[in-house]
């Protein structure tokens, strides 16, 4: 099962890459819908509910990781913490650390250098627009490719391998797409990310989830 989903994710990633090669201006067009040209700013702000969501997406992984680590340590020494689903909880945490943590925020965001929409010339910035998968030196760290906030929504993919029926897996998939897409739209409205940043974020988190599952649960497939 894991191998199928990993291959599926890689195939989707390839065709998404081809799609954005064929339509290189799509990112600019999508971002333009969130840009107020008369005010020279993006319509989404960092106050109120949007500000809370942005804060939550940034700091929830820290809070969650601390709780999980304390719980797992406690389960080693305290009987009442020794529950049936300890491995499942650890799996969900590892998916967070590997997908949104390592792959999204460290490998890509800190090393790809893609300038954010608010930084490019088309939206009153001074940087040159770069398509996805093109490494750039215009941004030093915490850059546009891919979307970190959206990865927290796509992290819900981690529940898919743990659910028994196809219907429940589908519900988890839809929930991840809705949550990740919603957080991605929020960041697009703030000028923080392009559409392709959100798309590839979802793909990367999906693939990393099933890789973690293959390593933790299905080693015999490899």
UniProtKB/Swiss-Prot annotation:
Topology relative to the lipid bilayer, per the entry, is: Multi-pass membrane protein
EC number in record? 3.1.-.-
Null phenotype? Lipid A retains the 4'-phosphate group (giving bi-phosphorylated lipid A) and a 3'-hydroxyacyl chain not usually seen in wild-type cells. Cells grow more slowly in liquid culture and are more sensitive to the CAMP polymyxin B. Bacteria are avirulent upon infection of C57BL/6 mice, the natural host of this bacterium; they do not colonize mouse spleen. Upon mouse intraperitoneal injection induces pro-inflammatory cytokine IL-6 and monocyte chemoattractant protein 1 and keratinocyte-derived chemokine, two potent chemoattractants; bacterial viability decreases about 100-fold.
Gene3D superfamilies attached here?
Answer: Phosphatidic acid phosphatase type 2/haloperoxidase (1.20.144.10)
Q: Which Pfam families match?
A: PAP2
Keyword terms, alphabetized: Antibiotic resistance, Cell inner membrane, Cell membrane, Hydrolase, Lipid A biosynthesis, Lipid biosynthesis, Lipid metabolism, Lipopolysaccharide biosynthesis, Membrane, Transmembrane, Transmembrane helix, Virulence
Membrane-crossing residue ranges in chain numbering: 4-24, 59-79, 88-108, 145-165, 170-190, 194-214
Q: Which GO terms describe its molecular function?
A: hydrolase activity
Q: Name one GO biological process term.
A: lipid A biosynthetic process
One cellular-component annotation, GO: plasma membrane
Q: Which residues lie on this side of the membrane: Periplasmic?
A: 25-58, 109-144, 191-193
> Which sequence ranges are listed under topological domain Cytoplasmic?
1-3, 80-87, 166-169, 215-222
NCBIfam families given for it?
LipidAPhtaseLpxF
Q: Any miscellaneous information on file?
A: In Francisella lipid A is mono-phosphorylated at position 1- and tetraacylated, it lacks the 4'-phosphate residue found in E.coli. More than 90% of lipid A is in a free form that lacks core oligosaccharide and O-antigen.
Q: Which family does it belong to?
A: Belongs to the lipid A LpxF 4'-phosphatase family.
Summary of the function given for this chain in its UniProt record:
Removes the 4'-phosphate moiety from lipid IV(A) (a tetraacylated precursor of lipid A) and from pentaacylated lipid A, but not from hexaacylated lipid A (as is found in E.coli). Does not dephosphorylate phosphatidic acid, phosphatidylglycerophosphate, or the 1-phosphate group of lipid A and lipid A precursors. Its expression in E.coli confers resistance to the cationic antimicrobial peptide (CAMP) polymyxin B.
Stated name of the protein: Lipid A 4'-phosphatase
Source organism of the structure: Francisella tularensis subsp. novicida (strain U112)
State the organism's lineage. Bacteria, Pseudomonadati, Pseudomonadota, Gammaproteobacteria, Thiotrichales
The primary gene name is lpxF
